[in-house]
Each structure stands twice: as C-alpha cells, then as structure tokens.
C-alpha cells in the first residue's frame, strides 16, 4: 500500500511538472492603474503600451481612467486591479485631487494607504509614479492636513510627502516625476494638449518609469 501511495505521488508530481513545462509558468502581469495620464496617448500610444514593448515577457494591463481620483481609484480597485491577480502594480493617482482641491490631505492619505495596503496584501509589488515628488512648500509655509481648498503648491507638496511616507512604509518603488523628461512644456511635439502627453511623450514617460519598474521585477 505504501509503495502504491508513493508511486501515485511520484506520478502526480511528474504530471504537474509536465503541465508546467507544456503550458508555461504562471503568467506575469503588471497593472498600470491611474487617471488620464495612464489612459492618454491613443491606440498603442499609452505609456503602458511602451512598457509592453520593453517587457515582452510580461502582460501589461492598462487600468487608467480619465478624471480618476484617489477616492475613485479606491472605489474601483477590485474591478480595475485586484481581479486581474497580477504580481505587479504601477500606480499614478492624485493629479485630479490636486486640481480640484476638494479634500483634505489626510483624506487623500487614507485612500492612498488603503489602496497600497490591499494591493500589498494581495502579494503585489508596487511602483508609485508621481508628478509631485520633487515639490516643496514655499519658504515659511506650513501644511494643514485637515483643511480642504489649500493653495495648489501646498497640495503638491502635501501629496509628495504622502507618497514618500507610503512608499517607505510599503517598500514600494518610486518615480518622483514621471514627466521630468518632457517638461518644460515648450516641447509641443510631445503633448496632445496642455496636460496630456501624446505617444511620443509617453515613450519618454515609459523610459522614465522603466528603470524603477525593473527593480521590482527582479
């Protein structure tokens, strides 16, 4: 009986190895999750499309949605990210919260942390991409994390502080300024409008993201 059991287990292990070699290992997936800066660029012109060309061994899923905010991203997290069972996440949210200035920095931090916490709990490795990471408060200014309607430069500096704190806490990669290669915006050939890169601009954005992304793919 013991011999039969041993042979059965050996056969089962052989079968698993055979199926793995036949169908390949688990598919490696990266979700790019964000607002219009993730969805812009047109057909084959999004930064995620450029990343796909540089990383042919991965399937890259674009979950960008124009106008999205941190609260909106949290609300659609299951459908846009977690249902894909991806191993990696590139997340860029906060630009529309910055423009609207309707919520406090503490509210934004709470939503961002819940997103990162849930994705980390799902086993995902994360890169946070930003437009604000190099922003600083004006000299002599202080941040009020409990008041909405702050000046734009205060929001930018506050979001940068939130990002730096959370990437450290969740051991995430960080791209402080995803658009550093296409600003100042005098390069009109890289922009489809005043806020959104075109395909040529997104090629540079992808090249800016790629080195940090590779660090979590190792």
Could you describe each region identified by the protein language model?
Residues 1, 5-10:
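N-terminal export leaders
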Residues 10-20:
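Bacterial N-terminal signal peptides
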Residues 23-88:
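Serine-esterase "nucleophile elbow" of acetyl-processing enzymes
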Residues 36-39, 65-70, 95-99, 132-136, ...:
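Solvent-exposed loop/turn segments at secondary-structure junctions
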Residues 43, 136-218:
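Catalytic His-Asp segment of secreted/periplasmic serine-dependent ester chemistry enzymes
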Residues 44, 48, 52, 74-78, ...:
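Extracytoplasmic/secreted envelope proteins and their assembly/folding machinery
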Residues 58-76, 80-84, 97-126:
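Internal alpha/beta domain cores that form substrate/cofactor-binding pockets in large enzymes
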Residues 92, 96, 116-157:
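Active-site segments of SGNH/GDSL-like serine hydrolases
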